[in-house]
Amino acid sequence: AKTTAPSVYPLVPVCGGTTGSSVTLGCLVKGYFPEPVTLTWNSGSLSSGVHTFPALLQSGLYTLSSSVTVTSNTWPSQTITCNVAHPASSTKVDKKIEPRVPITQNPCPPHQRVPPCAAPDLLGGPSVFIFPPKIKDVLMISLSPMVTCVVVDVSEDDPDVQISWFVNNVEVHTAQTQTHREDYNSTLRVVSALPIQHQDWMSGKEFKCKVNNRALPSPIEKTISKPRGPVRAPQVYVLPPPAEEMTKKEFSLTCMITGFLPAEIAVDWTSNGRTEQNYKNTATVLDSDGSYFMYSKLRVQKSTWERGSLFACSVVHEVLHNHLTTKTISRSLGK
Protein backbone atom coordinates (compact mmCIF):
# COMPACT_ATOMS: atom_id res chain seq x y z
CA ALA A 1 0.00 0.00 0.00
CA LYS A 2 1.10 3.55 -0.73
CA THR A 3 2.38 5.80 2.05
CA THR A 4 -0.19 8.57 2.56
CA ALA A 5 0.17 11.64 4.78
CA PRO A 6 -2.71 12.50 7.13
CA SER A 7 -5.05 15.47 7.00
CA VAL A 8 -5.58 17.12 10.39
CA TYR A 9 -8.80 18.90 11.36
CA PRO A 10 -9.46 20.86 14.57
CA LEU A 11 -12.82 20.15 16.24
CA VAL A 12 -14.27 23.02 18.27
CA PRO A 13 -17.48 23.50 20.27
CA VAL A 14 -20.43 25.15 18.59
CA CYS A 15 -19.77 28.88 18.10
CA GLY A 16 -16.74 28.77 20.37
CA GLY A 17 -19.17 28.63 23.28
CA THR A 18 -18.92 26.46 26.35
CA THR A 19 -21.37 24.97 28.78
CA GLY A 20 -20.59 25.04 32.46
CA SER A 21 -17.00 25.21 33.65
CA SER A 22 -15.39 22.95 31.03
CA VAL A 23 -15.05 22.67 27.27
CA THR A 24 -14.10 19.69 25.10
CA LEU A 25 -11.88 20.21 22.05
CA GLY A 26 -11.02 17.62 19.44
CA CYS A 27 -8.51 16.73 16.77
CA LEU A 28 -9.28 14.47 13.79
CA VAL A 29 -6.39 12.81 11.92
CA LYS A 30 -7.75 11.37 8.70
CA GLY A 31 -6.64 9.40 5.67
CA TYR A 32 -3.13 8.20 6.53
CA PHE A 33 -1.13 5.02 5.89
CA PRO A 34 0.64 3.20 7.41
CA GLU A 35 0.36 3.29 11.19
CA PRO A 36 1.38 4.86 13.46
CA VAL A 37 0.77 8.54 14.04
CA THR A 38 1.58 10.22 17.33
CA LEU A 39 -0.83 12.84 18.65
CA THR A 40 -0.14 15.12 21.59
CA TRP A 41 -1.68 18.30 22.95
CA ASN A 42 0.59 21.31 23.43
CA SER A 43 3.60 19.10 22.61
CA GLY A 44 2.74 16.75 25.46
CA SER A 45 2.50 19.34 28.22
CA LEU A 46 -1.30 18.96 28.22
CA SER A 47 -2.08 15.37 29.21
CA SER A 48 -4.89 15.59 31.76
CA GLY A 49 -8.38 15.15 30.34
CA VAL A 50 -7.11 13.59 27.10
CA HIS A 51 -8.96 10.70 25.45
CA THR A 52 -7.44 9.29 22.26
CA PHE A 53 -9.41 6.63 20.39
CA PRO A 54 -7.67 3.74 18.65
CA ALA A 55 -7.00 4.18 14.93
CA LEU A 56 -9.69 2.87 12.60
CA LEU A 57 -8.90 1.35 9.19
CA GLN A 58 -11.38 2.19 6.42
CA SER A 59 -10.83 1.74 2.67
CA GLY A 60 -7.12 1.17 3.21
CA LEU A 61 -6.52 4.40 5.18
CA TYR A 62 -6.45 5.08 8.91
CA THR A 63 -8.42 7.66 10.90
CA LEU A 64 -7.67 8.61 14.51
CA SER A 65 -9.31 11.12 16.83
CA SER A 66 -8.47 12.63 20.19
CA SER A 67 -10.31 14.93 22.56
CA VAL A 68 -9.17 17.05 25.48
CA THR A 69 -11.37 18.60 28.15
CA VAL A 70 -10.14 21.84 29.73
CA THR A 71 -11.66 24.54 31.90
CA SER A 72 -13.46 27.36 30.14
CA ASN A 73 -10.91 29.68 31.79
CA THR A 74 -8.16 27.91 29.83
CA TRP A 75 -9.63 28.06 26.32
CA PRO A 76 -9.80 30.18 24.25
CA SER A 77 -7.77 32.58 26.42
CA GLN A 78 -4.76 30.23 26.23
CA THR A 79 -3.39 28.56 23.11
CA ILE A 80 -4.17 24.88 22.66
CA THR A 81 -2.49 23.03 19.80
CA CYS A 82 -2.92 19.50 18.47
CA ASN A 83 0.49 18.08 17.45
CA VAL A 84 0.47 15.25 14.92
CA ALA A 85 3.48 13.34 13.56
CA HIS A 86 3.39 10.65 10.88
CA PRO A 87 6.93 9.25 10.60
CA ALA A 88 6.27 7.17 7.48
CA SER A 89 5.49 10.27 5.39
CA SER A 90 7.81 12.58 7.38
CA THR A 91 4.76 14.70 8.19
CA LYS A 92 4.46 16.98 11.21
CA VAL A 93 1.39 19.16 11.71
CA ASP A 94 0.68 21.60 14.54
CA LYS A 95 -2.99 22.60 14.40
CA LYS A 96 -4.07 25.44 16.68
CA ILE A 97 -7.63 25.07 17.97
CA GLU A 98 -9.28 28.38 17.10
CA PRO A 99 -12.74 29.55 18.19
CA ARG A 100 -15.21 30.06 15.36
CA VAL A 101 -16.01 33.65 16.42
CA PRO A 102 -13.80 36.47 17.78
CA ILE A 103 -12.92 35.92 21.42
CA THR A 104 -14.33 39.35 22.32
CA GLN A 105 -17.75 38.42 20.90
CA ASN A 106 -20.31 36.67 23.08
CA PRO A 107 -20.82 33.59 20.92
CA CYS A 108 -24.16 32.39 22.28
CA PRO A 109 -26.24 35.00 24.15
CA PRO A 110 -28.06 33.59 27.17
CA HIS A 111 -31.68 32.44 26.85
CA GLN A 112 -31.35 32.24 23.06
CA ARG A 113 -31.18 29.20 20.86
CA VAL A 114 -27.58 28.30 20.00
CA PRO A 115 -26.92 29.65 16.49
CA PRO A 116 -25.56 27.11 14.02
CA CYS A 117 -21.93 27.49 13.04
CA ALA A 118 -20.71 27.33 9.48
CA ALA A 119 -20.45 23.61 8.81
CA PRO A 120 -20.93 21.46 5.75
CA ASP A 121 -24.38 19.98 5.19
CA LEU A 122 -24.63 16.45 6.52
CA LEU A 123 -25.42 14.74 3.25
CA GLY A 124 -24.65 11.21 4.37
CA GLY A 125 -26.47 11.14 7.70
CA PRO A 126 -24.94 9.60 10.82
CA SER A 127 -21.70 7.60 10.77
CA VAL A 128 -20.88 4.74 13.14
CA PHE A 129 -17.52 3.70 14.63
CA ILE A 130 -16.77 0.76 16.91
CA PHE A 131 -13.76 0.66 19.23
CA PRO A 132 -12.06 -2.22 21.09
CA PRO A 133 -11.57 -2.30 24.86
CA LYS A 134 -8.40 -0.87 26.35
CA ILE A 135 -5.83 -3.64 26.50
CA LYS A 136 -5.10 -3.10 30.21
CA ASP A 137 -8.82 -3.41 31.02
CA VAL A 138 -8.94 -6.75 29.19
CA LEU A 139 -5.82 -8.26 30.73
CA MET A 140 -6.17 -7.13 34.36
CA ILE A 141 -8.97 -9.07 36.06
CA SER A 142 -9.66 -6.21 38.50
CA LEU A 143 -10.58 -3.84 35.65
CA SER A 144 -13.74 -3.67 33.52
CA PRO A 145 -13.32 -3.87 29.74
CA MET A 146 -15.83 -2.22 27.42
CA VAL A 147 -16.48 -2.22 23.68
CA THR A 148 -17.67 1.20 22.52
CA CYS A 149 -19.93 2.23 19.64
CA VAL A 150 -19.88 5.93 18.67
CA VAL A 151 -22.52 7.49 16.40
CA VAL A 152 -21.59 10.92 15.02
CA ASP A 153 -23.33 13.51 12.83
CA VAL A 154 -26.77 12.85 14.32
CA SER A 155 -29.11 15.68 13.35
CA GLU A 156 -31.01 17.54 16.07
CA ASP A 157 -34.06 17.14 13.80
CA ASP A 158 -33.82 13.33 14.13
CA PRO A 159 -32.23 12.84 17.55
CA ASP A 160 -33.57 9.37 18.35
CA VAL A 161 -30.89 6.70 17.85
CA GLN A 162 -31.56 3.03 18.53
CA ILE A 163 -28.46 0.97 19.35
CA SER A 164 -28.61 -2.81 19.73
CA TRP A 165 -25.69 -4.98 20.83
CA PHE A 166 -24.93 -8.60 19.97
CA VAL A 167 -22.25 -11.03 21.21
CA ASN A 168 -21.75 -13.84 18.69
CA ASN A 169 -25.13 -12.78 17.22
CA VAL A 170 -26.95 -13.13 20.57
CA GLU A 171 -28.53 -9.84 21.65
CA VAL A 172 -27.47 -8.40 25.01
CA HIS A 173 -28.98 -5.50 26.96
CA THR A 174 -26.26 -4.30 29.35
CA ALA A 175 -24.88 -1.33 27.38
CA GLN A 176 -24.82 2.18 28.81
CA THR A 177 -25.70 4.86 26.25
CA GLN A 178 -25.26 8.63 26.48
CA THR A 179 -25.99 11.50 24.10
CA HIS A 180 -23.65 14.50 23.96
CA ARG A 181 -25.02 17.76 22.58
CA GLU A 182 -21.83 19.87 22.62
CA ASP A 183 -20.48 18.55 19.35
CA TYR A 184 -18.34 20.77 17.14
CA ASN A 185 -20.76 21.04 14.19
CA SER A 186 -24.15 21.50 15.83
CA THR A 187 -24.91 17.77 15.74
CA LEU A 188 -25.31 15.11 18.39
CA ARG A 189 -22.88 12.35 19.30
CA VAL A 190 -24.20 9.14 20.84
CA VAL A 191 -21.80 6.89 22.75
CA SER A 192 -22.81 3.36 23.77
CA ALA A 193 -20.44 1.34 25.99
CA LEU A 194 -20.96 -2.40 26.40
CA PRO A 195 -19.32 -4.06 29.45
CA ILE A 196 -17.80 -7.36 28.34
CA GLN A 197 -16.25 -10.42 29.94
CA HIS A 198 -12.45 -10.56 29.78
CA GLN A 199 -12.48 -14.10 28.41
CA ASP A 200 -15.09 -13.28 25.74
CA TRP A 201 -12.66 -10.82 24.14
CA MET A 202 -9.59 -13.01 24.54
CA SER A 203 -11.35 -16.04 23.02
CA GLY A 204 -12.26 -14.10 19.88
CA LYS A 205 -16.00 -13.62 20.33
CA GLU A 206 -17.56 -11.14 17.88
CA PHE A 207 -19.18 -7.95 19.17
CA LYS A 208 -21.66 -6.12 16.97
CA CYS A 209 -23.51 -2.84 17.38
CA LYS A 210 -26.54 -2.17 15.19
CA VAL A 211 -27.57 1.46 14.80
CA ASN A 212 -30.83 2.85 13.46
CA ASN A 213 -32.00 6.41 12.96
CA ARG A 214 -34.65 8.06 10.78
CA ALA A 215 -31.91 9.70 8.69
CA LEU A 216 -30.49 6.29 7.72
CA PRO A 217 -31.92 4.38 4.75
CA SER A 218 -31.20 1.14 6.63
CA PRO A 219 -29.52 0.19 9.93
CA ILE A 220 -25.72 0.33 10.13
CA GLU A 221 -23.93 -2.65 11.66
CA LYS A 222 -20.33 -2.58 12.91
CA THR A 223 -18.49 -5.61 14.26
CA ILE A 224 -15.22 -6.06 16.10
CA SER A 225 -13.28 -8.93 17.64
CA LYS A 226 -9.77 -9.62 18.85
CA PRO A 227 -7.50 -10.01 15.81
CA ARG A 228 -5.89 -13.42 15.34
CA GLY A 229 -2.21 -13.81 14.60
CA PRO A 230 1.20 -14.80 15.96
CA VAL A 231 2.07 -13.88 19.53
CA ARG A 232 5.38 -13.13 21.20
CA ALA A 233 6.19 -11.92 24.71
CA PRO A 234 7.93 -8.56 25.14
CA GLN A 235 11.47 -8.21 26.44
CA VAL A 236 11.67 -5.37 28.96
CA TYR A 237 14.81 -3.42 29.88
CA VAL A 238 15.11 -0.41 32.20
CA LEU A 239 18.01 1.89 31.38
CA PRO A 240 19.62 4.29 33.90
CA PRO A 241 20.09 7.99 33.17
CA PRO A 242 22.81 8.82 30.63
CA ALA A 243 25.95 10.07 32.35
CA GLU A 244 25.66 13.39 30.47
CA GLU A 245 22.26 14.01 32.08
CA MET A 246 23.35 13.28 35.64
CA THR A 247 24.65 16.82 36.11
CA LYS A 248 21.12 18.25 35.69
CA LYS A 249 18.40 18.66 38.31
CA GLU A 250 16.10 16.39 36.31
CA PHE A 251 16.91 13.47 34.04
CA SER A 252 15.39 10.46 32.30
CA LEU A 253 14.86 6.80 33.05
CA THR A 254 14.07 4.75 29.96
CA CYS A 255 12.04 1.57 29.62
CA MET A 256 12.71 -0.29 26.37
CA ILE A 257 10.13 -2.90 25.35
CA THR A 258 11.00 -5.02 22.32
CA GLY A 259 10.00 -8.08 20.32
CA PHE A 260 6.29 -8.30 21.15
CA LEU A 261 3.22 -9.42 19.22
CA PRO A 262 0.45 -8.34 18.97
CA ALA A 263 1.02 -4.58 19.16
CA GLU A 264 -1.49 -3.91 21.96
CA ILE A 265 0.43 -3.12 25.14
CA ALA A 266 0.21 -0.92 28.24
CA VAL A 267 3.18 0.65 30.03
CA ASP A 268 3.33 2.77 33.18
CA TRP A 269 5.69 3.69 36.01
CA THR A 270 5.73 3.71 39.81
CA SER A 271 8.21 5.03 42.38
CA ASN A 272 8.32 3.35 45.79
CA GLY A 273 4.98 1.76 44.88
CA ARG A 274 3.23 5.03 44.04
CA THR A 275 1.91 5.74 40.54
CA GLU A 276 4.04 8.17 38.53
CA GLN A 277 2.51 10.64 36.04
CA ASN A 278 5.59 12.34 34.57
CA TYR A 279 6.26 9.86 31.78
CA LYS A 280 5.70 9.65 28.02
CA ASN A 281 5.27 6.56 25.86
CA THR A 282 6.13 6.35 22.19
CA ALA A 283 3.74 4.68 19.79
CA THR A 284 4.44 1.03 19.03
CA VAL A 285 6.77 0.69 16.04
CA LEU A 286 6.95 -2.24 13.61
CA ASP A 287 10.46 -3.75 13.71
CA SER A 288 12.31 -5.41 10.84
CA ASP A 289 11.50 -8.92 12.15
CA GLY A 290 7.74 -8.28 12.16
CA SER A 291 7.48 -7.73 15.91
CA TYR A 292 6.91 -4.40 17.68
CA PHE A 293 8.96 -2.22 19.99
CA MET A 294 8.41 0.97 21.98
CA TYR A 295 10.03 3.19 24.60
CA SER A 296 8.77 4.87 27.74
CA LYS A 297 10.62 7.80 29.33
CA LEU A 298 10.16 8.86 32.95
CA ARG A 299 11.40 12.27 34.13
CA VAL A 300 13.00 12.01 37.58
CA GLN A 301 14.19 14.69 40.00
CA LYS A 302 17.86 14.26 40.83
CA SER A 303 17.09 14.68 44.54
CA THR A 304 14.57 11.81 44.41
CA TRP A 305 17.06 9.59 42.59
CA GLU A 306 19.82 10.33 45.09
CA ARG A 307 17.54 9.41 48.01
CA GLY A 308 17.51 5.87 46.62
CA SER A 309 13.89 5.74 45.47
CA LEU A 310 12.94 2.52 43.68
CA PHE A 311 11.43 3.09 40.22
CA ALA A 312 9.50 0.40 38.38
CA CYS A 313 8.39 0.09 34.76
CA SER A 314 5.30 -2.14 34.51
CA VAL A 315 4.28 -3.73 31.21
CA VAL A 316 0.91 -5.38 30.50
CA HIS A 317 0.74 -7.72 27.48
CA GLU A 318 -1.33 -10.80 26.71
CA VAL A 319 1.63 -13.20 26.29
CA LEU A 320 3.27 -12.41 29.66
CA HIS A 321 2.80 -14.70 32.66
CA ASN A 322 -0.19 -13.24 34.54
CA HIS A 323 -0.18 -10.63 31.71
CA LEU A 324 2.26 -8.44 33.68
CA THR A 325 5.98 -7.94 34.17
CA THR A 326 7.78 -5.27 36.18
CA LYS A 327 11.42 -4.19 35.97
CA THR A 328 12.94 -2.00 38.68
CA ILE A 329 15.84 0.41 38.97
CA SER A 330 17.28 2.66 41.66
CA ARG A 331 20.49 4.59 42.22
CA SER A 332 22.14 1.54 43.78
CA LEU A 333 20.82 -0.85 41.11
CA GLY A 334 21.76 1.53 38.32
CA LYS A 335 25.42 1.66 39.20
From Swiss-Prot:
Domain of life according to the entry: Eukaryota
GO BP terms: antibacterial humoral response; complement activation, classical pathway
Positions of the Ig-like domain: 6-98, 126-225, 234-330
A GO CC term assigned to this protein in UniProt: immunoglobulin complex, circulating
Note: The sequence differs from that of the a allele, from BALB/c mice, at 15% of the positions.
Residues carrying sugar: N185
Gene Ontology molecular function: antigen binding; immunoglobulin receptor binding
Pfam families on file: C1-set
Keywords: Glycoprotein, Immunoglobulin domain, Repeat, Secreted
Organism name: Mus musculus
Signal sequence extent: none
Protein name stated in the entry: Ig gamma-2A chain C region secreted form
